[in-house]
């Protein structure tokens, strides 16, 4: 009797090789996929060799289970991390301090109107980014999208501009943090720079999980502080503070001078408001380090609505009711004392609270500093994956850290010590930082505009090549027209910045002011043309645009909402969009 006389294949009865069981704690070391595009590889469980040996081994190259040579980023961020990062990501010195100069330049009405307009713009931008980030949770995120969906040369130019923005922001924010301490003490700024430099280096060297936990705590503090200020500001405005001799304020202050410096002041506030939202897009950059982008990113994206509605608009309306735009303290020397939030508390003669809120400002600056190193390092790593930066920046260790890119970024933090050059009675550091920041001053507009244009190209190509939106894990409810509007807003931002750079408030046209405001556009154009000549890249047609590599598609049954039917469907859609 032979095997073929039986009703089964003899190989089917051979014992199968069982996969080893992995505990939940150890699953953190294992990624869900491995592709060259996403930069994800399987993390091999570390051996128990002792703390110091594992610490040393952690710096060794990541082990690539599939042997494809792709660099690795560890998926160590959870839903909890992403949602707090999205809420607190843009709550920082732009809101707490930058709003003061905006109030002085354009008046309270200009501040409120422009922050609402920029909030609407970011609503469209972040939803477009969220859709692409769920579909392509890749290293480099929106910089990768610009390279693939727009033009490789444009992706190269925008990526380097974006990198320089956060690369320079790191030492600048360290200096800002040190200056903020002058609110309490005259201790040399170099002392505080050293302390916070060590702290930031430590946070980043411990990996993305520690980064996520630190940002979670810092964001939570900022959220609580901002909500607390809103409540306090309402009490102050209603005359509920016994130490405030002004009594009931109401709208008496905002009526005096709602607008300042005319149209020029309005345009100036428009660009200042846009800079205040810098960092919102980091949620998309972190997609490559999120365990389940489809479940995590949509919730983080939807938090943009609440961030704009509550933390920016409400708090700035109250600031406009409490602080006069003519207050000379608003245009101070860059310390925390010029914060309109601190001024509002000081004007009410509340003892102790100004120091508390000054501490919150320091925390927010630390958060921005921490995010800057994370963003610059991941951007440089992503560019190396796309061959837009030297290949050695792809190096990733066994803990999922882009080690060489991080070392380069963290090393530039020592540049903050140039602040000591001011001790001799000159302003060398101010001049140097002004021009360093000018190199990438428009990177936000280029990045946000590129996100919208990438989404437009992605949607057009997706439809052209016969795909359905039902295949996507998350779909922007604003669709392609939301991205068109978002792109239009960013073009207006560039036009407004050109206008105020050419005709500065309180001065006549001059080369210094113009190039400090618009140098980034010139440099980006040079990078774009230079890469075009070098690579001879071209814009692909819609039917040839590569939308399949790395695309994560889903069955419609998994993505549709079974409750999205019935008489309340329209209201459910609105609630699902913002909640």
UniProtKB/Swiss-Prot annotation:
Natural source organism: Schizosaccharomyces pombe (strain 972 / ATCC 24843) (Fission yeast)
Membrane topology (Extracellular): 105-108, 185-186, 237-265, 325-347, 423-431, 493-513
Cytoplasmic-facing ranges: 1-83, 130-161, 208-215, 287-303, 369-401, 453-471, 535-579
Source organism superkingdom: Eukaryota
Topology relative to the membrane: Multi-pass membrane protein
Record's keyword annotation contains Hydrolase: no
InterPro entries given in the database record: AA-permease/SLC12A_dom, Amino_acid_permease_CS, APC_YAT
Transmembrane segments: 84-104, 109-129, 162-184, 187-207, 216-236, 266-286, 304-324, 348-368, 402-422, 432-452, 472-492, 514-534
Higher taxonomy: Eukaryota, Fungi, Dikarya, Ascomycota, Taphrinomycotina
Protein's recorded name: Amino acid transporter 1
Keyword set, alphabetical order: Amino-acid transport, Cell membrane, Golgi apparatus, Membrane, Transmembrane, Transmembrane helix, Transport
Function: Probable amino acid transporter that may play a role in function in microtubule organization since it causes microtubule defects when overexpressed.
A GO-annotated cellular component: membrane
Gene assigned in the entry: aat1
């Amino acid at each position: 009797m032979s095997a073929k006389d039986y009703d089964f294949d003899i190989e089917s009865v051979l014992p199968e090789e069982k996969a080893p069981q992995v505990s939940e704690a150890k699953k953190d070391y294992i990624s869900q996929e491995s592709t060259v595009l996403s930069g994800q590889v399987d993390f091999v469980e570390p051996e128990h060799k002792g703390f110091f040996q594992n610490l040393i081994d952690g710096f060794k190259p990541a082990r690539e289970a599939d042997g494809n040579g792709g660099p690795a980023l560890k998926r160590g961020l959870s839903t909890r991390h992403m949602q707090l990062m999205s809420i607190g990501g843009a709550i920082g010195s732009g809101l707490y301090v930058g709003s003061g100069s905006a109030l002085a330049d354009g008046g309270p009405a200009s501040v409120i109107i422009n922050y609402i307009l920029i909030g609407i713009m970011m609503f469209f931008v972040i939803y477009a980014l969220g859709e692409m980030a769920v579909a392509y949770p890749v290293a480099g995120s929106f910089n990768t999208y610009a390279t693939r969906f727009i033009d490789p040369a444009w992706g190269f130019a925008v990526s380097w501009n974006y990198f320089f923005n956060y690369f320079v922001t790191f030492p600048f924010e360290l200096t800002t943090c040190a200056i903020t301490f002058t609110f309490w003490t005259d201790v040399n700024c170099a002392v505080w720079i050293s302390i916070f430099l060590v702290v930031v280096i430590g946070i980043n060297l411990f990996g993305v999980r520690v980064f996520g936990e630190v940002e979670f705590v810092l964001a939570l503090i900022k959220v609580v502080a901002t909500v607390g200020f809103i409540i306090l500001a309402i009490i102050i405005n209603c005359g509920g503070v016994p130490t405030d001799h002004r009594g009931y304020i109401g709208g008496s202050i905002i009526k005096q001078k709602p607008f300042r410096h005319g149209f020029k002041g309005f345009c100036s506030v428009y660009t200042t408001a846009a800079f205040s939202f810098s960092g919102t897009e980091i949620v998309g950059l972190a997609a490559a380090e999120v365990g389940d982008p489809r479940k995590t990113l949509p919730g983080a994206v939807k938090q943009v609505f609440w961030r704009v509605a509550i933390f920016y608009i409400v708090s700035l309306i109250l600031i406009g009711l409490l602080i006069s735009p003519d207050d000379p303290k608003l245009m101070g020397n860059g310390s925390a004392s010029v914060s309109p939030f601190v001024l509002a508390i000081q004007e009410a003669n509340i003892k102790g609270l100004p120091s508390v809120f000054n501490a919150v400002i320091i925390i927010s600056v630390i958060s921005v500093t921490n995010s800057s190193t994370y963003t610059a390092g991941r951007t440089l790593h992503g560019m190396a994956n796309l061959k837009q930066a030297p290949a050695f920046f792809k190096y990733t260790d066994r803990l999922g850290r882009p080690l060489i890119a991080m070392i380069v970024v963290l090393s530039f933090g020592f540049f903050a010590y140039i602040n000591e050059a001011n001790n001799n009675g000159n302003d060398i550091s101010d001049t140097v930082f002004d021009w360093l920041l000018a190199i990438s001053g428009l990177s936000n507009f280029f990045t946000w505009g590129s996100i919208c244009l990438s989404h437009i190209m992605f949607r057009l190509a997706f439809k052209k090549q016969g795909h359905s939106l039902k295949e996507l894990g998350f779909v922007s409810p604003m669709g392609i027209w939301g991205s068109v509007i978002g792109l239009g807003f960013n073009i207006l931002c560039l036009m407004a910045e050109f206008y105020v750079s050419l005709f500065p408030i309180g001065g006549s046209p001059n080369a210094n002011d113009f190039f400090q405001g618009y140098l980034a556009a010139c440099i980006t154009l040079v990078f774009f043309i230079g890469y075009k000549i070098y690579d001879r890249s071209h814009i692909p047609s819609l039917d040839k645009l590569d939308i399949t590599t790395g695309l994560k598609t889903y069955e419609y049954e998994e993505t549709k909402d079974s409750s999205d039917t019935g008489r309340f469907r329209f209201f459910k859609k609105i609630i699902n969009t913002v909640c």
